[in-house]
């Protein structure tokens, strides 16, 4: 399984990457915003996307919308990991087609549970 981690904050990318590795997901790549991530998604055969919301260039919500609008990418599972905890933003992400939503700060257990739930829904 190949996972793309998108966040403009390199420390957060590293935290997510390390947590994913601890969960057994070792094949990861990183991008610092949606503008960088979208071409990587087109050429990289990714199986899963973890993205922040607030980033310069293309935001995570715009990246999510671009993924859902793309015939080749629209089935890609997307987990949003963000500080955006307002109800309106969670609803906006759900309406845009996000598969899971984690509010920062979070624990490894929360990340694990969200990823497992996404796979249950995608595979079930």
Curated annotation (Swiss-Prot):
Keywords (A to Z) from UniProt: Chemotaxis, Cytoplasm, Flagellar rotation, Magnesium, Metal-binding, Phosphoprotein, Two-component regulatory system
PROSITE patterns: RESPONSE_REGULATORY
Cytoplasm in keyword set: yes
Cofactor: Mg(2+)
Gene3D superfamilies, sorted: 3.40.50.2300
Domain Response regulatory: 2-119
InterPro entries: Bact_response_regulator, CheY-like_superfamily, Sig_transdc_resp-reg_receiver
Entry function: Involved in the transmission of sensory signals from the chemoreceptors to the flagellar motors. CheY is likely to be involved in changing the direction of flagellar rotation.
Protein name: Chemotaxis protein CheY
Gene behind the chain: cheY
